[in-house]
Amino acid sequence: KWGAENNVDYVAVSFVRRKEDIIEVRRVLEAAGASAKIIAKMETRQSVDNLDAILEVVDGMMVARGDLGVEMRTEDVPMIQKEIIERCRMQGKPVIVATQMLDSMIRNPRPTRAESSDVANAVIDGADAVMLSGETAGGKYPVESVETMNRIIVRTEQDVALWCRKPRSLPAVCETADAVSHAARDVAKEVAAAAIVPLTSSGMTARMVSKYRPTCPIIAMTPSLSTWRQLSLVWGVMPCICPITHQLEESLKNAISLIKRESLVANGDNIVIMSGMPLGEPGSTNMINVIRIANVIARGLSLVRRRVTGVACKASSPQ
């Protein structure tokens, strides 16, 4: 209730054992009119046994390895971590890996090599986020811990395409929005797009695209401040506040203007825009547009009855 009153973005539920635990929390949030997403902290044997059922009703998961290692055998925890990450990726739901990531930095200014590898492997496995706890809550080197983890993540992501694990299988595409998200990933690759740009109110489209791990950034345009904050947790997504109306042309114009103004891609780059009709309705995504970002300096009539574009060159001399 406190979280609902203070407009929090996520509620992490501890010691989840079954899906009914999540349903009860959601009832409380809905009764309070809150839009917060629910993260299930996977830290009990029962939660692992009921993984699929819990995943159906939750918005994301956290692999809380500290308590999980107490309830289960130590040697089982690494594979459970990988299994939870994979299941979350298959459902397009964010997953956080937490606890003892850089534990030695509670006392020391540098992590062990094993801890560095632990962070890197969570990134390679496909986690949406890695989280510090004791290192920043009560450690001697909180700022250094954040800086160190950031460096490990950035370095790992430079070569992550070479080593990242792909899910053994993705679920069959059965919804229009999901199929469009899958297609957007492929189209972006074919046209060498600089970004995929979903127009989304709830954030659902951005999460669906993220599930397929495109090779370019996902610049999510949303009019909702809460959605903007929530999407900051999702893999590969850079959320932006952008006016989205029920008029598709106006919404596209707003998105492109923001991209140009903030220099989010280079002039001449292709972007893949995802939208749907009616705009603003969750799950309505059904269109893909490939647009080249450029400044229009002239317009004319095409004799071939289709849109044509070209690169304008400025001559500094007659030669």
Functional labels for PLM-detected ranges:
Residues 1-306, 313:
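Non-catalytic helical/linker scaffolds that mediate oligomerization, partner binding
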